[in-house]
Curated annotation (Swiss-Prot):
One of its GO terms (cellular component) is plasma membrane. CDD domains: 5TM_YidC_Alb3 (cd20070). Belongs to the OXA1/ALB3/YidC family. Type 2 subfamily. HAMAP family: YidC_type2. It comes from Staphylococcus epidermidis (strain ATCC 35984 / DSM 28319 / BCRC 17069 / CCUG 31568 / BM 3577 / RP62A). Residues 1-18 form the signal peptide. One of its GO terms (biological process) is protein insertion into membrane. This is Membrane protein insertase YidC 1.
Length: 278
């Protein structure tokens, strides 16, 4: 996962470095028309809604993006806890099947064991494939973030350039304090999230705790403070979202795992009873 994040952010840096929309003749192409121009227009619309307060306009964009990504995040967190807790209950059975796969002497035996494993996953309500949603929120957010970055770096007139002030800083210029806040938030976010994972699965989050603040600091110091504001609010909102999602779905998963354990014990008792009667 940390390799995926690194490649994504590296691609983000390369793409941003290669785009120059300072000249009107360069303001063409699919990316500019679909993302940059659309984001610029949407930012101006929200700016007018908030009476030329573009700080609130950017915060609104954060909330919209986070609510769009919320279902994917909830599915991922729910599946992670369900898979972890249910797997603990049926681990001996799954290990026995994996042992058959390991010691299979033919491809047919391996395929049969693999099919049996998938059937067990399905019967217990465990779906490992849902973990593939992990990178989807990043992929959805990337074009939005790049469009916002470009619309702030090359803004059209009569918008944020005329009303750039928000709180203590200028939204169109780099701001050291906003950069520090954004870096801190992106250190805290993976730190808080890592608490909900076993120690042997926290390496990714330790990597993010180091790499993310470095990337955010570099990008914020070379960008409009509006981008730092976007990152700060987005990270803060994600911290709250993840905390409540993990707390809720951990309880749900523990309850479902308890029901599964009781069901397996009952089936075992019934099987032993039938054996004795026979």
């Amino acid at each position: 996962m940390h390799k995926r994040l690194f490649i994504t952010l590296l691609g983000f840096i390369i793409l941003l470095a290669g785009c120059d929309y300072s000249k009107e003749e360069n303001q063409t192409g699919i990316f500019y028309n679909v993302f940059v121009k659309s984001m610029d227009g949407f930012l101006h619309f929200l700016g007018r809604v908030f009476q030329d307060n573009y700080g609130f306009a950017i915060i609104s964009i954060v909330l919209i993006v986070r609510f769009i990504l919320l279902p994917f995040m909830l599915i991922q967190v729910k599946n992670m806890h369900m898979m972890r807790e249910k797997t603990k209950v049926v681990q001996p059975e799954l290990d026995a099947i994996r042992d058959k796969m390991k010691h299979a002497t033919s491809q047919e035996e391996r395929n049969a064991a693999n099919q049996l494993l998938m059937k067990k996953y399905q019967s217990y309500g465990i779906n490992p494939l849902k973990n593939m949603l992990g990178c989807l929120p990043v992929l959805i957010q990337m074009p939005i973030l790049m469009g916002l970055y470009m619309s702030l770096k090359y803004p059209s007139s009569h918008g944020i350039t005329e009303y750039p002030h928000f709180l203590w800083f200028d939204l169109t210029q780099p701001d050291l304090i906003m950069t520090i806040i954004a870096a801190i938030m992106y250190f805290v976010q993976p730190l808080v999230n890592s608490i909900h994972y076993p120690k042997d699965q926290r390496k990714t989050y330790y990597f993010m705790m180091v790499f993310s603040p470095i990337f955010i600091t570099y990008a914020s110091l070379h960008s409009a403070a509006a981008l730092g504001l976007y990152w700060s609010i987005s990270a803060a909102f994600l911290i709250v979202q993840m905390h409540f999602a993990h707390s809720h779905y951990k309880k749900v998963a523990l309850h479902e795992a308890k029901k599964l354990k009781q069901k397996l014990e009952q089936n075992k008792d019934n099987s032993e009873l039938l054996t004795e009667e026979s």
